[in-house]
């Protein structure tokens, strides 16, 4: 789960990480009032969306008067902000963050993220913070340093010093930088985050180190014990189909193709999408119904897939382990009738009660195309949507 920058800064503030003063705004008038309350003389008007690259996309502007704040807020609020992370369709800006202007002398990058390979927390830092960190990672990876923190030990003073030295933090700011790293680590652990990123981390002309941005991702599996984090969720920033799917415990992710996929198991779902692409098709979604799918869940899955106007065909690929094939067959038949299915449907089932499931589909009277292998299923659905 992601949150907005201003929400992330509130969390950092709670853990003692220095951040500039700022006030969220939902209207142009609120933006003006926020600027007046902060007092200026320079403000930053920031679009609040769940994507990076806002500055390059025109979503972060400096204002030097209240009139500037009003004009920029009117320009940014409601715009369709396109960044390298939103895709070409962009994301509508519904919230702003009005923040004190900063004395920027040197920008750094700092983040901590779960590293599953080492089963540790990776601290990543760079002397080249700001809007072009992706380009730094691509062109000059030697400017990015990584250390791994054992969660049983925590971030040590020596590791903090290693980070400071690695990014060339001046001596008069090193102690403050290490303190921020330790507080960031505690924040990361205590909030069950999977990513906390500060980009940029600014050092001003007086040697003060301040977080000018905040990006958080939280482990969805831990949200049950973090109601205060769940309360920060902004459904407007999420795909409506994914939000709807989550209500029925369906793992759904929208893609750009035209072949809907309904599969049980994440691994099989990814393999199914790969196979569709191998045979010249493009999947329209990832959809894992899990091991406890009911006919009702299958019906809802069909409804969600078919809300996407790009879907021209559906492939159902089921391995009957925990999930019984006859249960899926019942769900498929029920779903086809409930949605009055008008697009080609290919079903491949293997495993528990396989023959019974196939028999039910064959006797349903519905134009369901059967397949025995993944390759056959992919070939048939790709041909059917041509």
From Swiss-Prot:
Highest taxon in the source lineage: Bacteria
Residues that coordinate or bind ATP: 46, 53-55, 99, 102, 107
Pathway the protein takes part in: Carbohydrate metabolism; tricarboxylic acid cycle; succinate from succinyl-CoA (ligase route): step 1/1
UniProt binding sites for Mg(2+): 199, 213
Catalytically driven reaction(s): succinate + ATP + CoA = succinyl-CoA + ADP + phosphate; GTP + succinate + CoA = succinyl-CoA + GDP + phosphate
Major enzyme class: ligase
EC numbers: 6.2.1.5
HAMAP family: Succ_CoA_beta
Role summary: Succinyl-CoA synthetase functions in the citric acid cycle (TCA), coupling the hydrolysis of succinyl-CoA to the synthesis of either ATP or GTP and thus represents the only step of substrate-level phosphorylation in the TCA. The beta subunit provides nucleotide specificity of the enzyme and binds the substrate succinate, while the binding sites for coenzyme A and phosphate are found in the alpha subunit.
Name assigned to this protein: Succinate--CoA ligase [ADP-forming] subunit beta
Annotated source species: Delftia acidovorans (strain DSM 14801 / SPH-1)
Name of the gene this protein is made from: sucC
């Amino acid at each position: 789960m992601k949150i907005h920058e201003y929400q992330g800064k509130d969390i950092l503030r709670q853990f003692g990480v220095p951040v500039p003063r700022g006030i969220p705004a939902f209207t142009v008038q609120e933006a003006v009032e926020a600027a007046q309350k902060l007092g200026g003389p320079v403000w930053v008007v920031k679009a609040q969306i769940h994507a990076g690259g806002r500055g390059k996309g025109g979503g972060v502007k400096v204002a030097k008067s209240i009139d500037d704040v009003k004009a920029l807020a009117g320009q940014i609020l409601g715009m369709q902000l396109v960044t390298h992370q939103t895709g070409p369709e962009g994301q509508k800006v519904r919230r702003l963050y009005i923040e004190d202007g900063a004395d920027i002398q040197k920008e750094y990058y700092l983040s901590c993220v779960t590293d599953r390979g080492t089963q540790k927390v990776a601290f990543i830092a760079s002397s080249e913070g700001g809007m072009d960190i992706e380009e730094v990672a691509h062109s000059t990876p030697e400017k990015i340093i990584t250390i791994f923190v054992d969660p049983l030990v925590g971030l040590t003073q020596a590791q903090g010093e290693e980070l400071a030295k690695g990014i060339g933090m001046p001596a008069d700011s090193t102690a403050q930088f290490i303190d921020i790293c330790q507080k960031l680590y505690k924040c990361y652990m205590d909030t069950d985050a999977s990513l906390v990123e500060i980009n940029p981390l600014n050092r001003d002309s007086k040697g003060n180190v301040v977080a000018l941005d905040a990006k958080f991702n939280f482990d969805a599996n831990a949200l049950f014990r973090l109601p205060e984090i769940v309360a920060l969720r902004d459904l407007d920033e999420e795909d409506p189909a994914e939000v709807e799917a989550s209500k029925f415990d369906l793992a759904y992710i929208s893609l750009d193709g035209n072949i809907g996929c309904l599969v049980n198991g994440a691994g099989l779902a990814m393999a199914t999408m790969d196979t569709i692409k191998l045979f010249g098709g493009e999947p329209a979604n990832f959809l894992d119904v899990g091991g406890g799918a009911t006919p009702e869940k299958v019906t809802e899955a069909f409804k969600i897939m078919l809300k996407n106007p790009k879907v021209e065909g559906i492939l159902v690929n089921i391995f009957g382990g925990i999930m019984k094939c006859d249960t899926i067959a019942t769900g498929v038949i029920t779903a086809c009738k409930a949605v009055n299915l008008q697009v080609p449907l290919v079903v491949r089932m293997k495993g528990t009660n396989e023959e019974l499931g196939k028999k039910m589909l064959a006797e349903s009277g519905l134009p369901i195309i059967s397949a025995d292998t993944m390759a056959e299923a992919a070939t048939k659905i790709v041909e059917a949507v041509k």
